[in-house]
């Protein structure tokens, strides 16, 4: 039953993205991660736009297809200018779109990633789902920029995502410099290493992705450990 509801949510997100295809935005967050790693379920879809004019166009489409504008929850990941839209799929089940306007600002650290920076570090890629066979070609944030954003944010889900996609990083020196420009790199990498070194972390990965081979786990972990000593 739960899996059916999650599939329903994913199908709705893909339908929504197809409706928004002519809009000017970049996919970030969990759905962006799905372009670089084994797909996982994501509660909502996060997109970045440059200005209020684009927001008006996107909002018009979302309202037309059944979404309602909602007040962002207090525990929302983001801070600053962003709008949330939700569509009920069931009496207790909804899908949501978070639209970040002008920048992506992390609530905990107040680190800012300008929308222009996000667009400059994005490209057209294939978006894959976890439960549906459909694929979409969308503008998605590049892996190095996504890693920088998630390593600055450093929530539990961010660290898990970093672990899964870090072996595919393209320019580690650049990633480090982007983190350093917004936060204490030592603080962020220490937090990540502490988390991925715990037994609970591997168990948590298995809960999301199923069986995780020990050799692959160690390879991924070592990639991050070596990043800690890299010189930018």
Whereabouts are the PLM-identified features?
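Compositionally biased terminal segments of proteins
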Residues: 1-232
